Structure formats: structure tokens, C-alpha cells
Amino acid sequence: MTSIAAAARPMFSFRNLNIVTTVIASLLFLILLGAPDIAWWLFGIEGGESADFVARRTAMLFAGIAALCWFTRNTPAGAAQSGIAKGLALAMVGLVMLGLTEWLRGFAGIGILLAVVTELALAVGYGRMACYPSGR
């Protein structure tokens, strides 16, 4: 195997990447549903009834992401795995762009960078998984 091929190979298997994503999405579900003030504090933004309303709805999306990742963690390489990886990579890239934009415009505090770094790592992981679906 050439060094270029070895460098392009994903560090995590699809299964392990999905398990990590399940844990992160489950934690976000619990925080946003039960204690959204933690997110407001971390991101340095103002909470309130409207923000809490959106947080509860967002929590359910994270529950769905957690379930999707958990129940598809053993999906073999192929079209389904590639589609899941591409969809999650797209979502993570979008979150990275939004997080950086909100931080640069001064709306979100420095804590948003924790989310951005995590989302970027997931975007790279799923992006590489989409390019090299067998996880060789």
C-alpha cells in the first residue's frame, strides 16, 4: 500500500464513527431538551422562552441523528453507507460554516469553537468515509 493510499484511509470505521456520533448527538439531545441553559452559556448567547422552544425542537432532531447513527452502525459498505456518510458530512459542514459565521459576526462567543471543531472532525470523518466506504 502506498503512503498516499494509507494517508487517505479513514482513521475510524463507519461503525466507530457512528458510535461516536451517537454519543455526541445523544448528549446534545439531553442538554437541549432538559438543560438548554448549558448551551446558551457555552455559546455565549442569550436564552429565553423562544430560544428554549427552538432548543426543544432541535433536541428531537439530535435524537433522530443519534438513532440513525446507532441503528445503521453495522451497515456494510455500499450505497446506503455512502448516502448516510454524505448526508452527515453535509450537515456537519453546514454547521461548521454557520458556527464560524456567527462567531465572526460576534453573535456567538468563543465556546462555539468547541462545536465547530467537533463538527469539522465529524465532517472530515464522514467525508472520508463517503470517499472510501469500505473503511479499509
Predicted regions and their residues:
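Membrane-helix boundary connector in multi-pass membrane proteins
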Residues: V96-L114, M129-Y132
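Core segments of alpha-helical transmembrane spans in multipass integral membrane proteins
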Residues: V23-L32, A51-N74, K86-G94
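Membrane-water interface at the C-terminal end of transmembrane alpha helices
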Residues: A121-R136
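Juxtamembrane helix-break-helix junctions at the cytosolic face
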Residues: C69-S82, W103-L104
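Hydrophobic alpha-helical membrane segments
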Residues: I84-G99, T118-A121
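Short, Lys/Arg-rich, polar N-terminal cytosolic tail immediately upstream
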Residues: M1-F14
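Membrane-helix boundary elements
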Residues: F14-V20, A25-D52
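Non-cytosolic membrane-interface motifs at loop->transmembrane helix junctions
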Residues: I45-D52, S82-G83, F107-T118
